[in-house]
Amino acid sequence: MPSSTVAKPKLAEKYPTWDGWVDSGEWAKTSPTGTLTLPANASEIMILALDPDVSVTQLARVTSRDQVLAARMLRLANSAYCAPLQEITTISEAVVRLGTASVRNVVLATCMASRLQSGNTYGVHGRGLAAHGIGTAFLAQLVARVAIVNQEEAFLYGLVHDMGKLLVLQLSKDYVRGGGKAPTEDEVVALLDARHAEFGGRVLREWHLPPVIEEPVVYHHRPDECASHPIEASVCYLADRLSHRYGFGCDASPDLPILDDPIATRLGITEAWLQDLDGRAPELFKSVTDAFA
């Protein structure tokens, strides 16, 4: 007796083009991965780090279970960026030095850097996106200090401001796995440019990160349209601009105007501050990227 089961149409039969599939939103159900996820250990550490009552002992114990994460925390705690007076040799000391919010950020940066090493998924874009995210994160902290907004939140939205690009790259591979024709490089780049901020917001909602992190990501190219967190969106915007100025994970644009930008003026950026950063940025970038290598 023949089976009554009706075969599901191939992905490419239902959605002949990749961008049509992406526009449909069906990928959230039909994609093998659906959306970007955090490893279980990383999720546990982030939850702990968000707990105002968490102890150094708790964080150190959980963090020590991940050798890669522990090594990166120690490297960062001893880097020129943190400038410790003496060498930090234990995870407990690193947690104290960095602070619980920074530990959360290091966890996410480590996960991001590790994920982007996957050439099969992110191809030639991966390493550049990792370096750009980490560089922008530290620049966002520096800008936030001037703007007098939360620096640890600034690190986080600076780090993940292009997270939507990772999802777009992942979806290009998932469509092929489902039987579709591989999109061209031009098609991928066009969607990256047009929708990465929107897709980044979707990823952060899946991760249950608060609006103060999500909205600066969604509006980092148009901060004046951000109603709820306009200052944070402006910090993210300017940090991204500075990252492009210095070539952090991308081609450098040293002539990119900063002081003429009204957003920089509103944030309190001065010529003296920018000149100081111009001199320090390359060394700081090297120290933090070495920590996450």
Predicted segments with their positions:
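Conserved alpha-helical "signature site"
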Residues: 1-178, 183-259
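C-terminal appended segment following the main domain
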Residues: 244-293
